[in-house]
Regions:
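Short glycine/proline-enriched loop/turn "hinge" motifs that connect secondary-structure elements
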Residues: 89-92, 133, 177-182, 249-253, ...
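Short beta-strand/turn micro-motifs at beta-sheet edges
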Residues: 97, 129, 174-178, 227-228, ...
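Metal-dependent amide/peptide-bond hydrolase catalytic core
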Residues: 1-5, 49, 58-60, 187-392
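Acidic/His- and Gly-rich active-site-bordering loop/insert found
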Residues: 2-109, 135, 145, 386
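Acidic/histidine-rich catalytic neighborhood of metal-dependent amide-processing enzymes
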Residues: 114-185, 387, 391-392
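Acidic-glycine-rich active-site phosphate/pyrophosphate-binding loop
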Residues: 86-102, 178-189, 318, 351
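Alpha-helical metal-binding/catalytic segments enriched in His/Glu/Asp
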Residues: 81, 101-148, 187-190, 201-221, ...
Length: 392
């Protein structure tokens, strides 16, 4: 159970955070998102007031990270809590930065994704700082930029800090997530020959050729859904995200471009996924000498797969059981991607745990206020269990 004092502080802090426009510049429409400067300054002030050592820097111009450090009293494990400060855009929302409380929920842009989590991290750090029992290992409270676009914040974070364990506090309905999918964006281009629509003997239609590719990708998608998949995240998937081809109705298309997304599961690599797509193109080319196409990776992120017996997973389970006064739900997986994968790639045992809510990336976003307070208590209890002296 959370204390009313924790509930009051997380609610007030969350409301303050929602009032600050931190729309990602890449997602605010015409590149006009406010970015993280104002919210980072606010978070840094809160960290200073708590008594943390504050590291405030910009991985890219105008895109700050803030890390508050509670130094450990010994040689215990180091722990990081990670939340992003940026949000998606606000199109269609009437008052996105006016926090509204209703039926135990707080509504507003970023309430669930993920300012509720950021508020919980700060209150948990405050509780630990005020405790008479210091942690044996360092605690790092990270507020990062740009998760909603290219994750430059956490990429810079893992270059700057090396920690033993991490909890990324993306919303999970207070369920422990230790695996999630990755993704690969692949650009496919088919080539044709431009000609007037009245001269079919001279034209080669790149759009029609892309149609063959799409048909084969649809078959592949059905095959992927039938695979056994990963125990926590299920099977992989794919979809055709963006398609562009041709210059005019009366002209044979000289080229057609597809950007597809392939959701990967632990054990799959981006290179394997690319080879799968290139294999389709090779088969189509073998069947028709006029067919010409290529595929390249545009962007990729790895999946997350933290072992069940990792110390950070065990400590988080204990924290959940203590705060909720019940055995936690079984560990689960997620179909979405988070910055946890970047921390794991850097060698940090990482899990994902966040509050309850709904409507992220929609016009009706909310977070459950009790769950935010619960998260703060779970984080603090987990830190006490995790940041202990390591066996020699």
């Amino acid at each position: 159970m959370h204390t009313e004092h924790t509930r009051d502080r997380t609610e007030r802090l969350l409301a303050d955070l929602v009032r600050i426009d931190s729309t990602n510049p890449a997602l605010g429409g015409d590149g006009h998102g406010a970015g993280e400067r104002e919210i980072a300054a606010y978070v840094a002030d809160v960290m200073h007031d708590i008594g943390l050592d504050v590291d405030h820097w910009e991985p890219a111009p105008g895109r700050p990270n803030v890390v508050g450090i509670l130094p450990g009293a010994g040689d215990g494990r180091s722990l990081m809590w990670n939340a992003h400060m940026d949000t998606v855009g606000v199109e269609g929302m009437d008052a996105p930065f006016e926090p509204t409380r209703k039926h135990g929920r707080l509504y507003g842009r970023g309430a669930q994704d993920m300012k509720g989590s950021l508020a919980a991290q700060l209150v948990a750090a405050q509780n630990l700082k005020a405790s008479d029992v210091p942690l044996a290992g360092d605690l790092l409270v990270a507020a990062v930029a740009d998760e909603e676009h290219k994750s430059i914040g956490t990429e810079a974070l893992v270059d700057r800090y090396d920690v033993d364990g991490a909890i990324v506090t993306e919303p999970t309905d207070l369920q422990l997530v230790r695996a999630h999918k990755g993704f690969v964006w692949i650009d496919v281009q088919t080539h044709g020959r431009a000609a007037h629509g009245s001269r079919p003997a001279e034209g080669i239609d790149a759009n029609m050729h892309m149609g063959r590719v799409l048909s084969r990708l649809e078959e592949l998608g059905r095959s992927l859904s039938g695979r056994q998949g990963h125990a926590l995240v299920g099977p992989p998937s794919l979809h055709a995200g963006q398609l562009r081809g041709g210059s005019a109705p009366s002209v044979y298309a000289a080229e057609c471009r597809l950007r597809m997304e392939r959701r990967t599961v632990p054990g799959e690599s981006a290179e394997e996924v690319l080879a799968e797509v290139r294999g389709i193109l090779d088969e189509l080319s073998d069947a028709d000498e006029a067919f010409e196409a290529e595929a390249e990776i545009a962007f990729a992120r790895e999946p997350l797969d933290t072992p069940a017996d990792a110390p950070i997973a065990a400590a988080t389970r204990k924290g959940l059981a203590h705060v909720l006064d019940d055995e936690p739900a079984p560990d689960t997986g997620a179909s979405f991607w988070t910055d946890a994968a970047l921390l794991a790639e850097a060698g940090t045992d990482t899990v994902v745990l966040g509050p309850e809510g709904a409507g992220l990336h929609t016009t009706d976003e909310w977070v459950d206020l009790d769950s935010v307070a619960h998260l703060a208590e779970v984080l603090a209890h987990t830190a006490r269990r995790y940041c202990v002296e390591q066996a020699s």
